[in-house]
Amino acid sequence: MRIAKIGVIALFLFMAFGGIGGVMLAGYTFILRAG
């Protein structure tokens, strides 16, 4: 459930920021997962 909860929060933040902010957040998250 923890992963699902984080996913929902991440999606909410992505929609909240939107635009360049959302892209930067997504890129940062991708770097964390890749690293």
Curated annotation (Swiss-Prot):
Segments passing through the bilayer: 6-26
Gene that specifies this protein: yohO
UniProt entry keywords in alphabetical sequence: Cell inner membrane, Cell membrane, Membrane, Transmembrane, Transmembrane helix
Membrane topology: Single-pass membrane protein
Official protein name in the record: UPF0387 membrane protein YohO
Compartments reported by the entry: Cell inner membrane
Major site of localization recorded for this protein: membrane
Family, as annotated: Belongs to the UPF0387 family.
Superkingdom, taxonomy of origin: Bacteria
GO cellular component, one term: plasma membrane
